[in-house]
Each structure stands twice: as structure tokens, then as C-alpha cells.
A protein has these predicted regions:
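ASCE P-loop NTPase motor core, strongest for the SF2 helicase catalytic module
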Residues: 1-95, 104-375
Length: 375
């Protein structure tokens, strides 16, 4: 029997009475929060064996792994409180490699990991080229960025606990919006040209790509930025651009994917929100993947890239990761690169770990370096 997570919740009264031979969860990150109804429903099912399939076992924090392992092997990682003390805090906040090693020793025997780069598993997948695209801010972006940092610095001086975490996460979101485009940050539907270094560079690269007859996926974590990109790219190149986001009905979503993947006259550009389009789609007709803004969990980004870099792809895939030089985007990227072994070991967390940094460390990350502004 095949069921969605929504139907599992609805029909749990019937399904939990069945002595299943096995229960297999696809996209198992859907049970990352043990308090949700769908997570509790999955844990209730009785089966001789359980399997969880996921490309992002740690989507937001290492705590996600506890919920999945608790479904597979109850008690293996202790209670939530024990896990937090033994692994979550040392890994998430302190980036302790010894804690990562201990967690691997416990979970490793129960994990089968397939890498697309392993030629023993997939022999005919073409190469993937990843490159960082460094962009500068316009003067307008620089002024807005400085204003957000000043506001955050004052707020952090007095904020504590949950309020402080809220300030940090809100500031991260605001600064990333500024780096994307002032119109996104201001939300004023203002003109787009000549105001964003990122957008200008994207247009240049898309122009070259279209001239070569290539197709591209463009990922953003912000639905409003997706709308901005769609409008600007359609106006600039005079051709339809698809945009898939969380508000697109399933039927329309299927039509968009089918058009892009199978129709010769379909649009060459497909914008997708990271959450709505980052998993479960086969879009191998694209051979370019643009990450317009970065999600600070490598596994989530890789999942999105794999919409194009997967079995069935016949061309080399070029992955372009946009960063604004001299801003928090570059600094966080540098931190992740320095701790790549830990990030790869337990799949780097999202942005929640940044809330654990000291105020001095946050000021250093938020600060705008001189090289950020265009000459």
C-alpha cells in the first residue's frame, strides 16, 4: 500500500491496527520534527522492519537525525534530552569533531549512503562542475545593508534568549534580501535594472547560456524573489519563464514539469523555490543550475542541484552558486568551508547554529567589507 503523509494522519486509526511486514518512508525528512502529527503517526505504525529514505537526513539541525533514527531504532540515541546534551549542543553549537565521530559510530551501521560520484553505483552520469559566482553590491544595496547591520547591532546589545535568536534570524533574512535585490527587501515593486550586482550577473550568464541553446534551473529560497526574477527575465529576454513555488497547485505543477522536461518548444528557464522544487522532481533537460541565494545546508542545496544532476542526464551539469563578496554570504561560506569535515560528517546545519554565536562573532559576520561595493 502507498500512502501520503497526509493520508497517514487521516487513516491512522485503521493503519496502526495492521501488522505490516515493513514500513518505508520516502523523503523521511518529513518526520524531522517528532512533535508533528505526521511524525507521531509514522512512529505508531507496527512493522517487522522500517526503512527511511532521504537525501537530507539533517535539514535544519542535527536534531533532525534524532527523530529519523528514533523511528528506525527507538532508543538508539537516547531520549531527546540525552541526545541534546550528548550530541546536539557539542555538534550544533560547539562544532566538536569528537562528538561527530561518536555519533557516526552509533548511526553508521544503520546507514547506507549512495553518492552520485561513486562510479561503482552510477557509471554513466556525466561530470558536474560547481563554481562560486562572486558579485558586488550596488551603492544602494551597500547603504541598505549598513542600515540593517546598525539596527541589528543595537538590538543585540539588549536581547536575550529566544528574543535574541529571533533578532539573529531576522537579520540574516534581511541581509540576504538586500544582497538579492533592494526591491525584495523594500517590497515596493520598484524598478529592477541597475540596482543589484547579483541580478546583473545572472542576466549576463543567462544570456550566454541561452545563446548556446542550454536550459537552466534557478533556485531561490524566497518566493517573492522568484517573482522578481521571473518578471525581469521575461522582460529582458522576451520569452516565457516558468516559476514553481509552494502556492502552485499540484496539477499545474505537474504540467510545468512535463512542459520543461518533455516539450521541444518549452521555456528554457525554470525558477523554483528551494522548498517547493528542491526535491522529488526530474528535470534533467537542464544542464545549468543557479543558486541565486544560498541555503546554508549543503545537503539541501545538493538535493536541489540533483533535480538536474541525476540518472538520465546526458550532459555536463554546471552549478553556479551566487555570493556577494564582503558580506555575510561570503563569510558564512568561508566558515562552512573551514569546517567542511564536520559539515560533511553530519550534514551541515541550516542557519540555526548561527544563533549560538556570541555578539562579537555576529558583528564580525554581519560587518560589510570594503570590497563588497562595486567600483
Amino acid at each position: 500500500m502507498i500512502s501520503s503523509y497526509a493520508l497517514l494522519q487521516r487513516d491512522l486509526g485503521i493503519l496502526e491496527e495492521v501488522p505490516w511486514a515493513g514500513v518505508v518512508l520516502d523523503e523521511a525528512q518529513n518526520i524531522k520534527n517528532p512533535e508533528t502529527k505526521q511524525s507521531r503517526a509514522a512512529h505508531t505504525l507496527k512493522a517487522d522492519y522500517r526503512i527511511a529514505l532521504t537525501g537530507t537526513p539533517v535539514e535544519n539541525s542535527v536534531g533532525d537525525l534524532w527523530s529519523i533514527m528514533e523511528f528506525l531504532n527507538p532508543g538508539l540515541l537516547g531520549s531527546q534530552a540525552e541526545f541534546k546534551k550528548t550530541f546536539f549542543i557539542p555538534i550544533q553549537a560547539q562544532r566538536d569533531p569528537e562528538a561527530v565521530k561518536r555519533l557516526h559510530q552509533l548511526t553508521g551501521p544503520f546507514i547506507l549512503r549512495r553518492l552520485k560520484t561513486d562510479k561503482a553505483i552510477i557509471t554513466d552520469l556525466p561530470e558536474k562542475m560547481e563554481m562560486k559566482v562572486f558579485c558586488t553590491l550596488t551603492k544602494e544595496q551597500g547603504s541598505l545593508y549598513a542600515a540593517v547591520v546598525e539596527e541589528a547591532t543595537q538590538a543585540l546589545e539588549s536581547a536575550e534568549g529566544i528574543k535574541r535568536k529571533g533578532v539573529v534570524l531576522a537579520t540574516l533574512s534581511k541581509l540576504k534580501q538586500v544582497c538579492n535585490h533592494p526591491a525584495q527587501f523594500l517590497g515596493d515593486n520598484s524598478p529592477l535594472p541597475d540596482r543589484s550586482g547579483k541580478l546583473a550577473r545572472l542576466v549576463e550568464m543567462v544570456e550566454e547560456m541561452l545563446a548556446a541553446g542550454d536550459r537552466a534551473l534557478i533556485f531561490t529560497q524566497f518566493a517573492e524573489m522568484g517573482e522578481i526574477l521571473k518578471r525581469h527575465l521575461q522582460e529582458t529576454f522576451g520569452q516565457e519563464t516558468l516559476f514553481l513555488h509552494g502556492g502552485v497547485p499540484q496539477k499545474q505543477r505537474d504540467v510545468m514539469v512535463d512542459r520543461f522536461q518533455n516539450h521541444p518548444e518549452a521555456p528554457n528557464l525554470f525558477i523554483l523555490s528551494l522548498k517547493a522544487g528542491g526535491t522529488g522532481l526530474n528535470l534533467t533537460r537542464a544542464n545549468h543550475v543557479f543558486h541565486f541565494d544560498r541555503w546554508w545546508n549543503p545537503a539541501v542545496e545538493n538535493q536541489a542541484t540533483d533535480r538536474a544532476f541525476r540518472i538520465g542526464q546526458s550532459r555536463r551539469v554546471q552549478v553556479h552558486k551566487f555570493l556577494c563578496v564582503g558580506t555575510l554570504e561570503e563569510k558564512i561560506d568561508e566558515m562552512i568551508e573551514r569546517k567542511k569535515e564536520i559539515a560533511a560528517g553530519v550534514v551541515g546545519a541550516g542557519e540555526s547554529w548561527l544563533t549560538e554565536l556570541s555578539t562579537a562573532e555576529l558583528k564580525e559576520i554581519f560587518a560589510l567589507r570594503k570590497e563588497a561595493l562595486e567600483a
